[in-house]
């Protein structure tokens, strides 16, 4: 049989097919070992590096004014995006494909996406929108990094319990992420440092800008309310971590808790004070089984000493020796530790003995309250300044609500006043005093009564008549004593009217120091609340106009003055949920709300529905409580505008997300084929975007530095070099409108002097670009409108300038430039014998006046403009009517008087 000879094509086909090289078992083992070594190296180098960087951000960030201002924020963003690049490398070598695995992940990505969309197509301040977008991206980066640190860290803290105790099961069997405890302790330590630093500023040891202002602790972040929210969240973190520690190490967590509680109290943040009680109840509900009683006892152990010590040290901080405040603080810490020790001993007792101890402790507590609080409160009021003591005002106050306007009231009190003067002491003007103030709209007070009394012969009944005005809303009654050697005792204080008999006990004023009573009950409380509601109402107006995509980061600051019903300054909404809606639209708002909703649902599902083991449950509590505290406080303030607080929050979210895993999801990850490209995708994203954003933020940082340098050169008179630097700044940071504005201002003189059309066009283009980047900025709008008016088209320029009345309806500047621009045109046309156009602009002045009267309520500031225009038009009577309204403080007063003199001289 003839042998088969393949065709030429078959031969070529056979030659081209090389047999696959089989990998021997030993080579496979070597490759696997190499992969394990690379992965181990990544864990040993990259993971600790990420932990160090996150720790530095948590510890150092708040000291740089909370990373609120542009320079500090850019530096932080650059570091964070470098951190994100490292995270990408870590994910790549770990071949970890996990990326979106929970509703929280989706909410965070949607939040970032919504800010990106608003920046690209709807931002009214491009530079601020870019800054906010980068800030959200940095928050997400911190979240992902902390999540992986919790997942992959392997070194355990010695503080963690190693065997079963009254919390429950051995922790190793409860699937708690290995790095979670470490991360939470780093977060707690960073907040403890801030608490100590804040108290140290008040004690006079060191100083940070705005850290202790208006006798309120504001922390190195410089804003008291945000400091209160931050430390309140850390307070609950500290108490939630305590049950996870070994034996008596639990009480150590009371030390930071006491420091934080004292600091929160001394921030004088009414919002934080208001939220503490409901959050305390939530803490008990959220605590793991077996730790609910401990939660109550530990909150009591930290609050009972902290509250009186805060009252004690507040005046010490304001004295000549503020450092003496540390002694009461140390006493508070000692008392808290003793109470914590007592709590642990109580929890270790059998149930029968617990009941006995509880009944005994409750009885002792009631007796103490009766002796030290109830009895003093039912005794007569006593105010005394002893002989030899310095002159000082001692007072008690009570605010009375539900006061009838135009009502007749009688203030009746029994008084006993005494005087005991030393031989070298002059007789005082009075021994005691009583004052009544009536609150009227506008947060103003009207004095209805002030009486200075002398000594009495025993008890005397004194009666005062009070007549409230037509707008009086409530009364403030104050009793006081001032001079050494004088004392007054008052009992049975009554406020009588035909309809009611109100007894005044001054209970809260007797319990609380003056500053605390004033902070809680004074008229300023209503002013603060009313302003908050006014902000919220104006925010809703903005949302109604831009509900879908928002206005980009900085949107509220750009437009709020166009929506307000009265003038106020507030670049933040004081409600971060509404602010996100304004900036990122409905998707951003839902995503932001979804962060708390999804996190809460995950906590409820894992702990209350699936019944997580006690230790894992308590870890959930440790991350849930501070997140809930920050979320609640952010409904009344702008905490997350400070990047340091945002980093704090997103580190907590990342830590909490590490607890929210699904066994089926985890196993599906582990079963992925080794060669799948998907497992490298998150790492590639981190490497590419991390590196790109790192470089981009470095460029923006350089642009900011060059911008400032150009301004310094301009102020120093070096115009030529300033222009060179501005061009560099524009190239580095093309969204910064101030550079375009400064550039066109600098070149105007030369362009006009040389009548260079190219330079004039360049000047207009620069002014237009500045306006386009920030169309709600009155300076850029005014500048562009003025240039159009002077060099292009008068009517077009006026149309832009007239927009100032829309942008600033409650500010003088919004009306003055439109009016003065028309006066300039009127003067020009009359000088050139063109009365027709002059009359057109003259009539428009009255339109501006009518609009100003309707929106601003007072047109006196443009009276000179209209009066001069009337004078130029020959209408002397009209000119006098307006010019006589020009006040002496007006810069045009002398000119107005000259015109008046001229007119009256002509008439004579």
What are these regions (language model features)?
Residues 1-188, 238-254, 276, 280-394, ...:
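Transmembrane signal-anchor hairpin modules in multi-pass inner-membrane enzymes, especially those
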Residues 256-268, 629-635:
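Membrane-interface alpha helices of multi-pass inner-membrane proteins
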Residues 426-432, 460-497:
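Extracellular beta-strand ligand-recognition surfaces/modules
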Residues 59-68, 576-584, 619-649:
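Membrane helix-loop boundary segments at the extracytoplasmic
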Residues 249-252, 586-621:
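Hydrophobic transmembrane alpha-helices and their immediate junctions
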Residues 206-241, 271, 319-329, 452, ...:
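Membrane-interface segments at transmembrane-helix junctions in multi-pass inner-membrane proteins
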Residues 223, 418, 513-573, 577-580, ...:
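TM-adjacent membrane-interface loops and short helices in multi-pass inner/ER membrane proteins
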């Amino acid at each position: 049989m003839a042998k088969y000879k393949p065709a030429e094509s078959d031969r070529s086909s056979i030659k081209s097919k090389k047999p696959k090289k089989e990998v021997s078992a030993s080579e496979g083992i070597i490759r696997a070992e190499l992969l394990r070594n690379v992965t181990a190296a990544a864990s040993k180098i990259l993971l600790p590096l990420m932990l160090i960087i996150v720790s530095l951000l948590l510890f150092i960030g708040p000291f740089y004014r909370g990373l609120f201002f542009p320079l500090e924020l850019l530096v932080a963003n650059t570091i964070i995006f470098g951190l994100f690049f490292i995270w990408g490398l870590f994910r790549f070598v770990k071949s970890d494909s996990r990326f979106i695995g929970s509703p929280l992940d989706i909410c965070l990505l949607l939040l970032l996406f919504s800010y990106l969309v608003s920046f690209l197509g709807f931002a009214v301040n491009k530079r601020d929108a870019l800054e906010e977008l980068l800030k959200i991206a940095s928050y997400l980066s911190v979240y992902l990094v902390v999540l992986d640190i919790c997942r992959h860290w392997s070194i355990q803290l010695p503080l963690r319990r190693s065997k079963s105790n009254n919390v429950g099961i051995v922790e190793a069997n409860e699937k708690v992420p290995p790095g979670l405890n470490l991360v939470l302790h780093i977060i707690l330590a960073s907040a403890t440092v801030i608490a100590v630093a804040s108290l140290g500023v008040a004690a006079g040891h060191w100083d940070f800008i705005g850290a202790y202002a208006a006798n309120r602790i504001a922390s190195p972040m410089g804003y008291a309310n945000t400091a209160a929210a931050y430390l309140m969240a850390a307070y609950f973190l500290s108490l939630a971590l305590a049950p996870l520690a070994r034996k008596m190490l639990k009480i150590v967590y009371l030390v930071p808790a006491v420091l934080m509680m004292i600091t929160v109290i001394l921030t004088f943040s009414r919002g934080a004070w208001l939220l503490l009680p409901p959050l305390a109840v939530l803490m008990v509900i959220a605590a793991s089984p077996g730790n609910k009683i401990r939660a109550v006892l530990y909150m009591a152990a930290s609050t009972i000493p902290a509250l009186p010590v805060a009252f004690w040290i507040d005046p010490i901080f304001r004295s000549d020796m503020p450092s003496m405040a540390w002694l009461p603080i140390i006493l508070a810490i000692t008392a808290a530790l003793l109470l914590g020790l007592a709590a642990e001993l109580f929890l270790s007792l059998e149930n029968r003995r617990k009941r006995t101890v509880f009944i005994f402790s409750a009885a002792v507590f009631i007796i103490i309250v009766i002796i030290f609080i109830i009895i003093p409160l039912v005794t007569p009021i006593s105010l005394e300044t002893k002989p030899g003591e310095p002159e000082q005002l001692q007072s008690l106050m009570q605010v009375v609500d539900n006061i009838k306007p135009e009502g007749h009231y009688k203030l009746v009190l029994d008084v006993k006043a005494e005087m005991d003067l030393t031989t070298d002491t002059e007789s005082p003007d009075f021994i005691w005093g009583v004052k009544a103030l009536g609150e009227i709209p506008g947060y103003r007070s009207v004095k209805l009564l002030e009486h200075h009394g002398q000594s009495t012969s025993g008890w005397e009944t004194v009666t005062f008549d009070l007549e409230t005005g037509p707008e009086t809303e409530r009364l403030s009654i104050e009793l006081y004593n001032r001079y050494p050697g004088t004392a007054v005792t008052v009992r049975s204080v009554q406020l009588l009217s035909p309809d009611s008999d109100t007894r005044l006990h001054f209970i809260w004023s007797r319990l609380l120091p003056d500053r605390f009573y004033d902070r809680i009950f004074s008229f300023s409380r209503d002013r603060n609340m009313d302003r908050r509601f006014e902000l919220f109402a104006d925010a809703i107006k903005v949302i109604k106009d831009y509900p879908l995509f928002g206005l980009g980061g900085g949107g509220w600051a750009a437009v709020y003055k166009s929506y307000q019903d009265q003038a106020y300054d507030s670049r933040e909404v004081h409600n971060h949920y509404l602010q996100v809606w304004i900036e990122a639209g409905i998707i951003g708002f839902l995503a932001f709300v979804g962060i708390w909703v999804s996190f809460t649902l995950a906590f409820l599902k894992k702990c209350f529905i699936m019944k997580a083991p006690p230790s894992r449950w308590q870890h959930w509590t440790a991350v849930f409580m501070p997140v809930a505290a920050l979320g609640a406080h952010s409904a009344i303030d702008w905490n997350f505008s400070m990047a340091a607080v945002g980093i704090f929050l997103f580190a907590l979210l990342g830590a909490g997300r590490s607890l929210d895993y699904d066994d089926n999801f985890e196993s599906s990850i582990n079963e992925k084929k080794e060669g799948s490209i998907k497992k490298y995708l998150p790492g590639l994203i981190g490497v590419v975007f991390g590196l790109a954003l790192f470089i981009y933020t470095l460029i923006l940082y350089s642009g900011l530095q060059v911008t400032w340098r150009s301004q310094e050169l301009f102020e120093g008179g070096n115009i030529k070099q300033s222009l060179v630097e501005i061009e560099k700044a524009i190239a580095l940071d093309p969204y910064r409108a101030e550079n375009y504005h400064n550039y066109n201002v600098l070149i105007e003189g030369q362009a006009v002097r040389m009548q260079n059309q190219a330079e004039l066009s360049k000047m207009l283009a620069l002014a237009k670009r500045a306006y386009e980047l920030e169309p709600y900025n009155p300076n850029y709008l005014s500048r562009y409108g003025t240039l159009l008016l002077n060099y292009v088209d008068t009517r077009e320029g006026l149309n832009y300038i007239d927009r100032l009345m829309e942008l600033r309806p409650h500010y003088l500047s919004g009306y003055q430039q439109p009016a003065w621009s028309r006066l300039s045109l009127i003067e020009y046309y009359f000088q050139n014998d063109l009365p027709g156009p002059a009359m057109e602009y003259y009539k428009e002045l009255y339109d501006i006046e009518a609009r100003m009267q309707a929106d601003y309520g007072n047109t006196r500031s443009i009276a000179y403009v209209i009066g001069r225009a009337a004078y130029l038009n020959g209408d002397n009577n009209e000119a006098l009517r307006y010019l006589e309204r020009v006040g002496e403080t007006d810069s045009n007063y002398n000119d107005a008087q000259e015109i008046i003199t001229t007119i009256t001289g002509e008439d004579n």
